[in-house]
């Protein structure tokens, strides 16, 4: 026996009564034969409908079995009930008001439904947009209308440029026309800005306009800041490619640096003193190298520019700071890395113009004590007039003594590297104690002898004293320094803390290969950098000599002007007095 599916829609009450009456009439018209041949139909199931009233109401198993356990004569009754049910469902579907195809075609704005063939990939039935309806998304390709969603505007435009111009002119406005609006009302956005440029830049987010194109690729962007961020990605890619290309060279340079650090930690000279004059850092400038030593390879040759390499004012400020540190005793007259760095910075100021300034230095005034350098070379810019820090009479003497000691120390270091070196005649200065101090109100104590400046002992083991023709003779006495045997032993001294434990002794004898390697590196360093050391220290000695000349001229100028001022005061006092004065001869 074939089974029929249950229909989803419910039946009207009248149709259900008709279906219940039809089986009863048919059962009455059946011929009565033998009692055994008559079908036995349950009265309880005859009064019930054969199908549930709604698809959600389930049928019980007893009802289903009762409906199925019928005789052959009741098949016609079931078929007639099913056909009647189909007819009633078709009539009910027409009564619910389904739209005919003709009606859908006559109404342009009516909603039409797609068949199973027209469903999209997600399984959802979408409503197709008619040809005459505008694009309400506010964005689209060329040829489609763009709707303005700024509040209740609703105007349509054929291109994104026209829509953007409409938003800027009609809705944003301008301050000069008194209609400036800094709140974005596009589809309830609500963004508030403080400038018109900000709101016009924000509107580009809503408008499908991308006028800013990338020169490196085919991408376009709505705002210039978006394009700027995108261009940085190209720059980062190029930098990564460059780093990948330069990686082997960088590894080679790193190996050289490690090799230099390995042998620089050991003493280079026999005395154990390592000179820092070619290892200091210069934060502002780079010391120009002598062309004859440019082929060594340790320092690159600086480029030749037609203008001044660095700012003169900044370097003169460095000179003034150096004098101020000397006054405040912040530095010591020892040729260290800090002093070498300061002198190299000052040398950039006087190194190019040193010859002109040494020939005719400009005097300084008493009030400002300004040092005006001589006219520079034709290719150099003349530095402006600068001022030295204010000096007292005692400060001049102390500063000059400091520079004298520093120059003697530098000269001793040069002699330790190059014993044949002699100071040039143009850089010789008299002893600082031979200067005339016109306003020295603090006389020297009676019987006190001039004390020569103390100079650090030279690093060369064979030189015990430094004697220059124009510098004071400085002797180094062995009796003043306690002689310790450990100073002359070729044994490395290592400091061990109290809490440290000595290493265990091993039976393996140490090899001398490391010592030979270190000694070879030391010889290479001496051979390569000896000439550079001497040249650098000579420049620093010239800088110290120049600073002493500037200081001496400033003191003499101030003394002369002070004498003139005192004479003028005496003359004015004699003129203003009512009684004659008698001066003692």
From Swiss-Prot:
Q: Which spans does this entry mark as compositional bias, Low complexity?
A: 9-29, 355-387
Q: Which segment of this protein is annotated as the motif YPX[LI] motif 2?
A: 579-582
Post-translational modifications:
Activated by C-terminal proteolytic cleavage by signaling protease (probably palB/RIM13) at neutral to alkaline ambient pH.
Return one GO MF term.
Answer: DNA binding
Which GO cellular component does the record give, naming just one?
nucleus
- Where on this chain is YPX[LI] motif 1 (motif)? 471-474
Which UniProt keywords are listed?
Activator, Cytoplasm, DNA-binding, Metal-binding, Nucleus, Repeat, Repressor, Transcription, Transcription regulation, Zinc, Zinc-finger
Answer yes or no on keyword tRNA processing. Answer: no
Bias-annotated ranges (Polar residues) = 30-47, 54-68, 90-114, 124-139, 568-579
Q: Which InterPro entries does the protein's record reference?
A: pacC/RIM101, Znf_C2H2_sf, Znf_C2H2_type
Q: Which GO terms describe its biological process?
A: positive regulation of transcription by RNA polymerase II
Q: Where is this region: Disordered?
A: 1-68, 84-142, 353-391, 555-585
The reply on keyword Zinc-finger is yes
Residues in C2H2-type zinc fingers run: 146-171, 182-206, 212-234
Its domain of life reads: Eukaryota
Q: Indicate where this protein resides in the cell.
A: Cytoplasm; Nucleus
Q: Cite the PANTHER family for this sequence.
A: PH-RESPONSE TRANSCRIPTION FACTOR PACC/RIM101, PH-RESPONSE TRANSCRIPTION FACTOR PACC_RIM101
Function (record text)? Transcription factor that mediates regulation of both acid- and alkaline-expressed genes in response to ambient pH. At alkaline ambient pH, activates transcription of alkaline-expressed genes (including RIM101 itself) and represses transcription of acid-expressed genes, thereby regulating the synthesis and secretion of alkaline protease XPR2 and acidic protease AXP1 depending on ambient pH. Specifically recognizes and binds the consensus sequence 5'-GCCARG-3'. Required for mating and sporulation.
Q: Which family does it belong to?
A: Belongs to the pacC/RIM101 family.
Quaternary assembly: Binds to DNA. Interacts with RIM20, which binds to the two YPX[LI] motifs and is required for proteolytic processing.
Q: What is this protein called?
A: pH-response transcription factor pacC/RIM101
